[in-house]
Amino acid sequence: MVGGLERYYQLARVFRDEDPRADRAYGEATQIDIELSFTSQDEVLNLVESMFIALVRDVFPEKYLTKIPFPRIPYAEALKKYQTEKPDLRQNKDDPNELAFCFIVDWPLFEWNKEERRWDPNHHIFTAPKPEHVRLIDTDPGRAHSLQHDFVLNGFEIAGGSIRITDPAVQEKIFELVGIKKEEGRHKFQHMLEAFSFGVPPHGGIAIGLDRMLIPLLGETNLREVIAFPKTGDGRDLMVGAPSSLSEQKLRELGIEVIKEKTSPKNKQTKKR
């Protein structure tokens, strides 16, 4: 966006160090990442809404939508009313053809880290605060809300994104608040802060989890049912036998040394006499 592209999307293969669960594969996912310049949160959400209305109409004609337009629910209201930030708004949860989409908006910008006694970003450090809440970064960070948005379908979070910060002064304030010192921030993000100082278009976007999106659309309950060659719970691919051990020769060719884990005396089992 800083480089002058007004709109772009990509199909991104994402690798993360995360534990698997019903709606998340072991360490990997496929996303449709959408980014727009000269945009607003409303424009991003309107784009996603129109895209999914067309998707359901053209690809899943047997299904129907609970509400149009899709509800936009503040984060605090979702927790108070549904006790979750991923509410399932279907009127009949036994109907496999009902699709209830909603957006969760107005998220807290920060959350308090009790262990380290500092503020952490609720989403990421580049998420823009609501314009009227910029002043709260200095005075009352816990009350500041952001331009973050999540997209939920039948109780599954299928997308998330935000509008980004474009003011270098605001960005440096947030760096400092979350424990990134000014010198460190300028060293790590100098290219970005310098670009911001020349002016950058307001921009933002959303990333749609392609695999996760298919779970409710196809009437499944687990991600393994909608992806090819799903891995086991401990990350093994039974189809190709991966991961596997490298031979000593391959390790030498690659310059890799395997360091065996030392067993502490506490973990050693002692036989009873």
Predicted regions and their residues:
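Class II aminoacyl-tRNA synthetase catalytic cores and aaRS-like
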Residues: 1-273
